[in-house]
């Protein structure tokens, strides 16, 4: 689950990390009120969307008067921002962040991730702030300094000081950075984060360190023990189909193809997409109904797939282990009847009650094509959508 920048900065502040003064605004009047409460005569206005690249897309503006602030706020709110990280429709701008400006002397990068290779939380710092860290990692990886955090003791002060020296910090800045990095490490673990980025972490002309931007991703598997953070979820920034899938505990990821996929098991789902591509098709989604799929969940999964206008055909690939194939067949037929599916549906059932499931499908007299194997299913659905 992603947080907006203003939410990330609220969390930063609660852990003692320095952030610019500012508030979120949902209309022009709120934006002007926030500006009147700040001591600066210039303000930064930032569109709040779950996507990077806002600056280049016009989602970050520097304003020097309240008239200009009102005009910018009006032009942003209620629109959709398209960046290199969004689709062609962009993300809705329902809120803006109005902040005081600061005089920047230098930009740094500070972040943390769960690193699979070390199976630890790894904190990363770089002198190359203000640019995408992926670009730095690709072009100049030696400029990224990594700290592996021992889960038994957490971030240690000596690690913070060593990192500060590598970043070229001096005197009081080292103390500031140590406090900041320790807070970041504690917050990462306390809040069950999977990603945290401060980019840029700036040094002002007066020598102060400030978190000028913030990005936070929370581990979705840990939300049950993070009720306050869960309440920060903004479903308007998420795909409607993904939200519906989440409500039914379905693992759904939209893709760009034309063949909808419904499979039980993540590995089988990926193999199914591979076979579709092997035979000249393009999958429209990844959808795993899970090992404990019910008739109702299968029916809902099919409805979600059909709601994607790009989908021209559907491949259902079910291996019956825990789940019975006859129940899957009933769910498929119920959904096909309810939604009035006009596109071809190819179904491959294998395992527990597979023969019974196939008989149910064959007797249905609906536009459902039975397949004897995964290869057969892929060939049939690719041929069907090509007609």
UniProtKB/Swiss-Prot annotation:
Where does the ATP-grasp domain start and stop, copy by copy? 9-244
**Any one of the GO CC terms:** succinate-CoA ligase complex
Task: Report the co-factor binding details.
Answer: Binds 1 Mg(2+) ion per subunit.
What is the name of the protein in this document? Succinate--CoA ligase [ADP-forming] subunit beta
GO biological process entries: succinyl-CoA metabolic process; tricarboxylic acid cycle
Which PANTHER family does this entry report, sorted A to Z?
A: SUCCINATE--COA LIGASE [GDP-FORMING] SUBUNIT BETA, MITOCHONDRIAL (PTHR11815:SF10), SUCCINYL-COA SYNTHETASE BETA CHAIN (PTHR11815)
Role, per record: Succinyl-CoA synthetase functions in the citric acid cycle (TCA), coupling the hydrolysis of succinyl-CoA to the synthesis of either ATP or GTP and thus represents the only step of substrate-level phosphorylation in the TCA. The beta subunit provides nucleotide specificity of the enzyme and binds the substrate succinate, while the binding sites for coenzyme A and phosphate are found in the alpha subunit.
Q: Where does substrate bind?
A: 264, 321-323
Q: Show the catalytic activity.
A: succinate + ATP + CoA = succinyl-CoA + ADP + phosphate; GTP + succinate + CoA = succinyl-CoA + GDP + phosphate
The record's comment on protein family reads: Belongs to the succinate/malate CoA ligase beta subunit family.
Organism, per UniProt?
A: Legionella pneumophila (strain Corby)
Which Pfam families does this one have?
ATP-grasp_2, Ligase_CoA
Per UniProt, subunit arrangement is: Heterotetramer of two alpha and two beta subunits.
High-level lineage: Bacteria, Pseudomonadati, Pseudomonadota, Gammaproteobacteria, Legionellales
- Cofactor(s) of this protein: Mg(2+)
**NCBIfam families in alphabetical order:** PRK00696.1 (NF001913), sucCoAbeta (TIGR01016)
């Amino acid at each position: 689950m992603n947080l907006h920048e203003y939410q990330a900065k609220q969390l930063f502040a609660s852990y003692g990390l320095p952030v610019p003064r500012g508030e979120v605004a949902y209309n022009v009047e709120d934006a002007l009120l926030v500006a009147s409460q700040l001591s600066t005569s210039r303000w930064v206005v930032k569109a709040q969307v779950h996507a990077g690249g806002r600056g280049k897309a016009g989602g970050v503006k520097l304003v020097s008067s309240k008239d200009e602030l009102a005009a910018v706020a009006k032009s942003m709110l209620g629109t959709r921002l398209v960046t290199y990280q969004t689709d062609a429709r962009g993300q809705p701008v329902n809120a803006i962040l109005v902040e005081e400006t600061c005089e920047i002397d230098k930009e740094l990068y500070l972040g943390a991730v769960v690193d699979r290779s070390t199976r630890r939380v790894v904190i990363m710092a770089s002198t190359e702030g203000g640019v995408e860290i992926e670009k730095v990692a690709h072009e100049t990886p030696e400029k990224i300094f990594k700290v592996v955090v021992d889960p038994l003791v957490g971030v240690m002060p000596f690690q913070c000081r060593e990192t500060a020296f590598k970043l070229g910090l001096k005197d009081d800045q080292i103390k500031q950075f140590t406090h900041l990095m320790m807070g970041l490490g504690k917050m990462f673990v306390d809040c069950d984060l999977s990603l945290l980025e401060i980019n840029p972490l700036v040094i002002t002309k007066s020598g102060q360190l400030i978190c000028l931007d913030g990005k936070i991703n929370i581990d979705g598997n840990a939300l049950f023990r993070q009720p306050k953070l869960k309440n920060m979820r903004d479903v308007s920034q998420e795909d409607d189909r993904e939200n519906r899938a989440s409500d039914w505990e379905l693992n759904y990821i939209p893709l760009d193809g034309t063949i909808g996929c419904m499979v039980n098991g993540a590995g089988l789902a990926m193999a199914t997409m591979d076979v579709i591509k092997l035979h000249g098709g393009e999958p429209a989604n990844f959808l795993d109904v899970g090992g404990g799929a019910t008739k109702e969940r299968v029916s809902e999964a099919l409805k979600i797939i059909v709601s994607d206008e790009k989908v021209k055909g559907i491949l259902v690939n079910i291996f019956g282990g825990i789940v019975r194939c006859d129940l899957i067949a009933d769910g498929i037929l119920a959904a096909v009847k309810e939604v009035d599916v006009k596109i071809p549906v190819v179904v491959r059932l294998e395992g527990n009650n597979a023969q019974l499931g196939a008989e149910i499908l064959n007797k249905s007299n609906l536009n459902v094509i039975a397949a004897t194997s995964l290869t057969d299913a892929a060939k049939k659905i690719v041929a069907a959508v090509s007609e």
